[in-house]
């Protein structure tokens, strides 16, 4: 009684399809898919920026030190 079976979910799906219509549900699905894709692309760009910053910080510069002459 506490959990929903597959039949409960199918009835809910049919009711939602009748209320909103399949075209509206398709639009909602494509909008949701676009949002997920945008989120994934943003995460990949953030990871690429992090690795770029790490490689820039790890560069070494070789220099020679000179003694300062006091006059």
Curated annotation (Swiss-Prot):
Pfam family, one: TatA_B_E
InterPro entries per the UniProt record, alphabetical: TatA/B/E, TatA/E
One Gene Ontology biological process: protein transport by the Tat complex
Family membership noted in the UniProt record: Belongs to the TatA/E family.
Purpose of the protein: Part of the twin-arginine translocation (Tat) system that transports large folded proteins containing a characteristic twin-arginine motif in their signal peptide across membranes. TatA could form the protein-conducting channel of the Tat system.
Main location: membrane
Gene Ontology CC: TAT protein transport complex
Segments for region (Disordered): 48-71
TM regions (residue ranges): 1-21
Keywords: Cell inner membrane, Cell membrane, Membrane, Protein transport, Translocation, Transmembrane, Transmembrane helix, Transport
Location in the cell: Cell inner membrane
Oligomeric and partner information: The Tat system comprises two distinct complexes: a TatABC complex, containing multiple copies of TatA, TatB and TatC subunits, and a separate TatA complex, containing only TatA subunits. Substrates initially bind to the TatABC complex, which probably triggers association of the separate TatA complex to form the active translocon.
UniProt key word Cell membrane: yes
Membrane topology listed for this record: Single-pass membrane protein
Source organism superkingdom: Bacteria
GO molecular function per UniProt: protein transmembrane transporter activity
Entry protein name: Sec-independent protein translocase protein TatA
Species of the source: Bordetella avium (strain 197N)
HAMAP family: TatA_E
